[in-house]
């Protein structure tokens, strides 16, 4: 069901309850959370915290549209890669307690720069194939984010989806991240076109520039072709959360997120 949502990220001065109340006050009706919001990996409570968080958001009229897994499938040691896959399985199980079936996922981060770039694809492909085996069991779907440097290419994302071959693997379409990576706007529009049928979740984000020249702004104030992204995704039948992500200078008090909500309310 379509909703205007927001990510629990870049809300300085708000704890989780404060975020929930402020976001609801602005008008948001769904949110994406981080795995740490609902689960303490070192003290696994079998989903009890996740259920409490779900009740918190229910109480302010919001649902949880997705949870970010915080996974990293680019690992120098095989044992660490296997541990990440095992952890991902548990994350999928825990996330179901929030009421969503969307696991917003990264590819990998190559922390420490220990893995050659030529090995990244194989590691991520094998990992997502392994994960595909238990998605049906937990009735969840993977929304692969175009995030960082390992997954920020729409042609590659589509290739991964096709090679994994699971209808439960799609994308979290971040409208800005491709530009941050360095793609030009025409190429980004191409990514919107080819990935639209595979969109499970969104990050509606705007800004200008790439890498060290990147500046985040409220929706509608940057250079991203947001209306074209909406057109492509809607045409493909997407009916999920339109989730605002704001990285501009007006984070205090949720001011930037107020502006994003106003744009989304007028355009989606």
Model-derived segments and spans:
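Catalytic domains of carbohydrate-active enzymes, especially glycoside hydrolases
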Residues: 19-36, 99
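Acidic/histidine-rich catalytic cores of soluble enzymes
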Residues: 3, 22, 30-31, 67, ...
